Amino acid sequence: MSSMPVHIERPAELTAKQRLQLEKKVRSMKYADLAVQGTNTSSIASKRSVERLYADVLGTKVQGSNGQPREYFKYFVSKPLRRSPCINRGYWLRLMAIRTSLRCIAEGTGQRDILVVNLGCGYDPLPFQLLDHTDDAQSEFDDRMSFVDVDYPDLIAKKLEIVKNTPELQHILGGAAGDAAGPVVYRTAKYMAAACDLNDSAAFGALTESFHPRSDEVVVFIAEVSLAYMRPERADAIIEACGRIPNSHFILLEQLLPAGEHSPFSRTMLSHFKSNDSPLQSVSSYPTISEQEVRFKRLGFKNVNAGDMHQLWRSLDKELVSKVQAVEPFDELEEFYLFCHHYIIAHATNDLSFRFGPKYAFPQVPQSPSKSCSSNSPMELVTAVDTDLLQRKFGASVVVDSDTILFSFGCLHNKLENILVMGDHDGAFKISKGPAPPARMCHTFTKLDDRTIFLVGGRQSPTKPLGDAWLLKLRDGEWHWEMCAPLMYPRFRHNCVNVGKGKALIYGGETDGATFLIYDCESNTYYEPVYPRTFPRKVSAAMCYDFQSNRGYILGGALDNMEVDDTLCTFAFDARTNSIEILETSSHPLYQRYGAKSVVREAGHMLIVGGVSPHMLFNDTTSIIEVELTTNKVNCLQIPSSLWKNHAQLLVGFELQIMSDGTVLIFGGGAVCYGFGAAWNGILRLGRETIAAIPLRIL
């Protein structure tokens, strides 16, 4: 009996269209991989900038050299660049985040050996730093560490080419120890380089099986902004595979969206990576610290210590922080806070007996107080003519007659030396030609009466503060600049309010001068009022004054130690005795703001807008608040959903004015969002009456 013929079904051949689609998909995947690899170039250049400027506070020093710094990034960056002070401080903190987590592990695991696996290592020279016996930084780890660098095959090959052509690095690693095999393409006694695409979970699983750690060896995985570019399920698979290895730790540093994807910094950050064809894919699934903690516990790491980068900054030794602050002039605190709140440093382990020491454990983040707040104040984005003219930050403004606003000086890419006139519908406002104040930012511009405006202080750079003062005076239908008596000490990021009878009260700021000063326009002199000498001189506080009640209010601002204050102080000014009396001081988490603005909106109600906080990123319910001054009750003004999603304002370096009809305008300002680009504001209106488009022109 003959057997039945066996039918073998062959796979259908691809059509020409399917082949083209497949080839296109492969090309797209390769291009995406190259774009992700390209992020290494920018990152390593920024770290080289830090290495050159911050060498004395990096902790890498040649042994016995009396403090001579040891450099490693220089081998991987052919043309060094100098980044901005904010980017430098941010990358210094990133380097410190990884080093601090490794130090925590070393201190908490006795004398056990530690295998460090750097996932998506790029050109990171961490192994060379901590294997270099001529570097003081190595000594604290007592020769306990060995390293595995893991990255795309092309990137690992380029890194190894640099290593093999650099005698100093070869000397640190020592000679080859055994043949390389499988994904491991280079091996010495304390170092391995492995070529692996982390998107290939099977390949990564095979790689981890090749480590063969001893039962008493600690395995540490580092992912510094590497899993962030992967789809969340693939990144989770990596973390879960690492969690199956006994005695393992995972150090994660990547982006957060603490106020959601629509907040201005987050929106700018996401757009930057998307436009560079390296979109952040995991952050939308794990946008907050608490969600990252849940993630790690679900994937096998039950013991988690996580915080944002500002929590890390606050945990550092105060002497070290002081040294960092002294490296280069720095006046970008708002941008630094914004950066810090958008990055997490998480240290997770499956060793339930491991304890995070007191100097490493992050305190639990307090719950946002916004849940107890509510308001239905209407808001809308106002149409403006030539909106690009609003691109200026840290200027100062006044309202003159007919609700025309003068927005003076400030900064775009450079300091501006002009005035933006807003709302002058008939074009009648003019300033005559003649001597005028030079360009500046962080100054004050205060209306003393209908014919006199007082400008004082500011800065050109953090090391070039200004002490000059000017009056803008109306004579014969035209406005004229007149120089008046200068300050004894320069001052910027200060406050100035009109207290009546041609007098201006100047408070705080960066200065060696008095906490309070009075400028008397009639006599063209300054003098100190009588005030409690214990009252702090704060920088970038919010200050306003209400003539009807003869009450002034000072909120937030930075103290001498750069801690941001969380108090609202009520004071009275007595013009007869030229004295200031502190009437009341209250505290609230939402008062803790640096760079906020305030105005008394109506009897007994004060509006507080914007600024930044060390402990939270302000969102659609906390960016704008109103205080009932008789009860100190805080109400949060909810920014409408459509406005927040499409036009959320970055309330830094902005201006706030109240118009004759009670309408409040918030305008100008913005910030450079770390290395991701700038975000600029339009005009936001608070009030019940719709207003017409606002014309803008430059004087």
Swiss-Prot record:
Pathway: tRNA modification; wybutosine-tRNA(Phe) biosynthesis
Record family assignment: Belongs to the methyltransferase superfamily. LCMT family.
Entry keyword set: Methyltransferase, S-adenosyl-L-methionine, Transferase, tRNA processing
Domain of life: Eukaryota
GO molecular function: tRNA methyltransferase activity
Official protein name in the record: tRNA wybutosine-synthesizing protein 4
PANTHER family, per the entry: TRNA WYBUTOSINE-SYNTHESIZING PROTEIN 4
Binding site for S-adenosyl-L-methionine: R94, G120, D151, D197, L198, E224
Species of the source: Eremothecium gossypii (strain ATCC 10895 / CBS 109.51 / FGSC 9923 / NRRL Y-1056) (Yeast)
Upper lineage: Eukaryota, Fungi, Dikarya, Ascomycota, Saccharomycotina
Keyword Nucleus found: no
